[in-house]
């Protein structure tokens, strides 16, 4: 007996207006282009405030491309424009080979979205959530039921198929949201802060699942504030500030170009006195609160200087993407 699809209580951004229209099989782009996303000189303002300012970048098919930036940098607006939910003031956007927003409906049939906050139907079961979402792509109940086992296996939720979403852990909900985004076998995944709020075990499982999708040829556009996540997953990334691109490249290349030396974090003592002490042996020194960040040209000489300072602790480490991000955007809080 065919299971009845439950009624969803809230509208979906993928819900069509008017007639039923064609199914996902007939509406999605047929050919897989070599460039999944192309933005050319895109601008967008809200009132007198520009939020995206002459932005251009391309995302190649099969790569993970990261959008990094502080709050207010324009990441959410860029994502909405790529989905055709916000119209740019100027510039050209092409997604999966079709122009957006003029043919956003067609582009969205090849896109899966994992939003920052889970919008699952908590009163429905895992299976029911997938059944409901598949209908937004005009998939039949039989088609959806056919892919549910593989999606749940991918998300490691095989034994939760009939569990209510309200009974799932935070990590399970995120994995279900990822599985739901794959219901239409999309060419492109847009992930907004996919592991925010998860414990390390759940976060690493999501990363492992995302790497498996990249190995299968999926394209990922990732926005995140977790620099380790971007460094681990992204083939290339773009750093934004105030709607402008301030850096673009491969994570390890940006680390070499922008930092290029060992970092010594110094704690205790007077930070300004410590900064003056190590500056002769440093490429760059930053003070943030009670911590001194020394980008050391000669780490051994820095350690020699610090060894004579009572009560001072320090940690020497390789540079990372967080160092690049903070160097480019500053250490002050941005709301």
From Swiss-Prot:
One of its GO terms (cellular component) is plasma membrane. The keyword DNA repair does not apply. Transmembrane segments: none annotated. Residues 37-267 form the ABC transporter domain. Residues 1-10 have a biased composition (Basic and acidic residues). Residues 1-22 are annotated as: Disordered. The keyword Amino-acid biosynthesis does not apply. Part of the ABC transporter complex NodIJ involved in the export of the nodulation factors (Nod factors), the bacterial signal molecules that induce symbiosis and subsequent nodulation induction. Nod factors are LCO (lipo-chitin oligosaccharide), a modified beta-1,4-linked N-acetylglucosamine oligosaccharide. This subunit is responsible for energy coupling to the transport system. The complex is composed of two ATP-binding proteins (NodI) and two transmembrane proteins (NodJ). This is Nod factor export ATP-binding protein I. It comes from Rhizobium meliloti (Ensifer meliloti). The lineage of its organism: Bacteria, Pseudomonadati, Pseudomonadota, Alphaproteobacteria, Hyphomicrobiales. The gene is nodI.
């Amino acid at each position: 007996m065919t299971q009845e699809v439950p009624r969803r209580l809230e509208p979906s951004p993928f819900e069509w207006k008017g007639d039923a229209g064609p199914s996902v099989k007939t509406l999605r782009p047929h050919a897989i282009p070599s460039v999944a996303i192309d933005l050319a000189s895109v601008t967008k303002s809200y009132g007198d405030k520009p939020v995206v300012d002459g932005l251009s970048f391309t995302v190649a098919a099969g790569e993970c491309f990261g959008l990094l930036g502080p709050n207010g940098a324009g990441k959410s607006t860029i994502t909405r424009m790529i989905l055709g939910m916000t119209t740019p003031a100027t510039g050209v956007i092409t997604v999966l080979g079709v122009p957006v927003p003029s043919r956003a409906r067609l582009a969205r049939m090849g896109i899966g979205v994992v939003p920052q906050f889970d919008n699952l139907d908590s009163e429905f079961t895992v299976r029911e959530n997938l059944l409901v979402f598949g209908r937004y792509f005009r998939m039949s109940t039989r088609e959806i039921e056919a892919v549910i086992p593989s999606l749940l296996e991918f998300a490691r939720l095989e034994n939760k198929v009939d569990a209510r979403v309200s009974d799932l852990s935070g990590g399970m909900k995120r994995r279900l949201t990822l599985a739901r985004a794959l219901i239409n076998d999309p060419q492109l995944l847009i992930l907004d802060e996919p592991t925010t709020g998860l414990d390390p075990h759940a976060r690493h499982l999501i990363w492992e699942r995302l790497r498996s999708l990249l190995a299968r040829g999926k394209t990922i556009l990732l926005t995140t504030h977790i620099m380790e996540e971007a460094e681990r997953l992204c083939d290339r990334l773009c750093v934004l500030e105030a709607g402008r691109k301030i850096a673009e490249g491969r994570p390890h290349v940006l680390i070499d170009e922008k930092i290029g030396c060992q970092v010594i974090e110094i704690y205790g003592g007077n930070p300004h006195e410590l900064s003056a002490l190590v500056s002769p042996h440093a490429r760059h020194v930053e003070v943030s609160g009670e911590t001194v960040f020394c980008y050391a040209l000669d780490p051994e000489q820095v350690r020699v200087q610090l060894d004579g300072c009572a009560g001072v602790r320090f940690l020497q480490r390789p540079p990372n993407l967080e160092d690049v991000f903070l160097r480019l955007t500053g250490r002050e809080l941005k709301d």
